[in-house]
UniProtKB/Swiss-Prot annotation:
Residues 412-421 have a biased composition (Basic and acidic residues). This is Probable protein phosphatase 2C 18. It comes from Arabidopsis thaliana (Mouse-ear cress). Residues 67-399 form the PPM-type phosphatase domain. Mn(2+) 1 binds at D103, G104. Its EC number is 3.1.3.16.
Amino acid sequence: MGLCYSVDRTTGKEPGEASSTATTAETVEERSGSGRWRRPRDLKGGGDIEGIPQVLGRLVSNGSSKIACLYTQQGKKGTNQDAMLVFENFCSRDDTVFCGVFDGHGPFGHMVAKKVRDTLPFTLLTQLKMTSESDQSSLVGANGFQIKCTEEEEVQTTESEQVQKTESVTTMDEQWCELNPNVNNDELPEMYLPLKHAMLKSCQQIDKELKMHPTIDCFCSGTTSVTLIKQGEDLVVGNIGDSRAVLATRDEDNALLAVQLTIDLKPDLPGESARIQKCKGRVFALQDEPEVARVWLPNSDSPGLAMARAFGDFCLKDYGLISVPDINYRRLTERDQFIILASDGVWDVLSNKEAVDIVASAPSRSTAARALVDTAVRSWRIKYPTSKNDDCTVVCLFLQDSSVAMEVSTNVKKDSPKEESIESVTNSTSKEEDEIVPVKDEKIPESCGIESKMMTMTLAECISVAQDDEEWSALEGLTRVNSLLSIPRFLSGELRSTSWRKWL
């Protein structure tokens, strides 16, 4: 409620309205000593910020804006553990936007995902502000990442942050060099290095706060995180876990292409596996799912985590699991159309190209994310009819104005060869309504007709269809039942919480 209170202050409400806000604050104050209700705190990235959804330009539920749309749908495994975020005018800059998708797992995965979603942007703002104060020259320039904190984003540095501010960042720098040996700093804009350091520090701080959180048990619960910050034509993407970011761009022939911006950080990747084994963790796949490598404790067949990096999951943090993001930079061009951020519930059943084509062929920008989620859900029923589909979450960030996209779409239609137009006769009706026309040589009818097929196909036919489909590579998605197989049983109750929180 702290942020709600500051928003009311700046908007100049009537006295009657202000009194209602004060009453709400008093109510929270009275409940601060019980259960999950806690005293409102400042926006340092570590507290429960009740009023965050009221920040202008911040979207966390199904909806859309002029430049983005987002949609999530609960799977058949229980509570929806996915979270998403679109934060426009980030850092109070009109040309800057922050987007993220967070896929939780474990008993409290939904709480961890929402916690990271709510705290990461403001923690990043805090770290950027600290960097700007300590080294302003590194942030100001032609492409500088200048920070202008509004009253809602103003952060007061606490004693714990003062301690972290004096800590050396040598360890993170070494990790960065090991993870990105081929990065040439001369080719990067001035805003990149400060932002990279701020992202590394923010993830480290959030993981520490999760470990000490009084109401969220993160011992065997965690979340992935795929985030992006777009400032002008500069794009910075950070990835922890197996959620994914994909860019839709056009080649010289105006054909729509899918470019994967992140790597699915699976335990069987050579670098990830080497680090885990060096820390005495184990990496192997079970016999009934040989294609899914998992992380296991040294002396216990648990928890079986299907990713090499994650927030939380402190039972594995001493055995190779890390929360260091894989950060990449890309300079956007006029050929780039949109970016898709999605959880693995989408990528397990759809390839990058299929996802790009579905978004491009959506009736409108506001329905693009939902169209992709709906197609993913139907694909789960077709490909794996006996499995429970996972939560599916999509964030679409559009890089071009709708008028520009329509013009490009028209040019593609005029320049398309005759032989390619024959293959696209079945899609001619939908193309007239599209803002961005998909590639002509891609076969879309299968995804478009899934719902009608489901009405007539028997279970045996569905299984045969799934078996006839081509195999999926590691980049296109893996089929698995759960991100976390089992929970290790050591101590119970307060004894366990006291034990693992001493690992700081």
